[in-house]
Design a protein with these regions (language model features):
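A short glycine-rich, Lys/Arg-flanked "PGG" loop and its adjoining helix->strand segment in the class I
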Residues: 164-179
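Core SAM-dependent methyltransferase catalytic element
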Residues: 212, 218-233
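Conserved class I S-adenosyl-L-methionine
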Residues: 181-206
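Helix-to-beta-strand junctions that scaffold the AdoMet/dcAdoMet cofactor pocket
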Residues: 101-102, 160-161, 174-176
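Class I SAM-dependent methyltransferase SAM/SAH-binding core
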Residues: 84, 88-140
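Class I SAM-dependent transferase core
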Residues: 24-76, 81-82
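A short SAM/SAH-binding and catalytic strip from SAM-dependent methyltransferases
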Residues: 149-163
């Protein structure tokens, strides 16, 4: 028993150190009532849009407001690609991407079981055979390492309860040289009619993704309301 004691103490020390790092990374304090009172790198994390927001995700005005067609053109999808739609929700983007990947596939990743159930029904009804629904956790995508050519996150990253851990998981799932496209409403533009907590600045996004090991490539600044930020592994 005496010989085990140093190892037990070492394990306890390492566990406490890791816990302390997690506590230091996130700050708990009040702020915008539409947030979760948890802050990361000076940014308050927003509340998650639940499955009750499906009608808003599928609204007819979305193409006009966000120019989804241009967003998809920016992606330059090639047949055979493996794309992950992170925070896929109702499958609005996944359904469109599934028609662009040819023999490839689209991982439609979401943390809500209700969204995954909705996606499964949509796949069945619309015969979207290239879509693979994936239920993630708050800290892990549940995707294989080095399996994805491109990731797309549209208006969802700012809601992640554990943005650092999720960014690490995204980095791991991307193939070497793979791209991550982050689309977020521009906080720099007061004319964008979205609540402040559901916006992000370019500088904030770059700071957070660089902290997880991503390289910033470019901002394709051609969407009406949103940043289109490209990061690489």
């Amino acid at each position: 028993m005496q010989t085990l004691k140093p190892y037990i103490l070492l394990f306890a020390f390492l566990s406490l150190s890791l816990f302390s790092l997690g506590q230091d990374r996130y700050k708990l304090r009040t702020g915008d009532p539409n947030g979760i009172n948890k802050w990361y790198m000076g940014r308050q994390i927003a509340q998650v849009m639940s499955h009750y927001g499906i009608d808003w995700l599928e609204r007819e005005e979305r193409e006009m407001e966000e120019n989804t067609s241009l967003l998809l053109k920016n992606l330059a999808v090639k047949p055979g690609m493996v794309i992950a739609d992170i925070g896929a929700g109702s499958g609005y983007h996944s359904a469109l991407l599934s028609k662009m990947v040819g023999t490839g596939k689209v991982f439609a990743v979401d943390v809500e079981p209700e969204m995954i159930a909705y996606l499964n029904e949509r796949i069945k009804q619309e015969k979207l055979s290239r879509i693979v629904p994936v239920l993630s956790t708050e800290q892990n995508l549940s995707l294989p390492e080095n399996s994805v050519d491109m990731m797309l996150l549209v208006d969802v990253y700012h809601e992640f309860s554990y943005p650092y851990e999720m960014a690490l998981s995204m980095l791991a799932a991307l193939k070497p040289g793979g791209k991550l496209v982050l689309v977020e409403f521009r906080s720099e533009d007061s004319a964008v009619p979205i609540k402040t907590i559901h916006k992000m600045s370019e500088a904030q996004a770059i700071k957070e993704f660089k902290a997880a090991g991503f390289r910033f490539d470019k901002n394709i600044d051609n969407l009406p309301w949103q940043h289109y930020l490209v990061f690489t592994k």
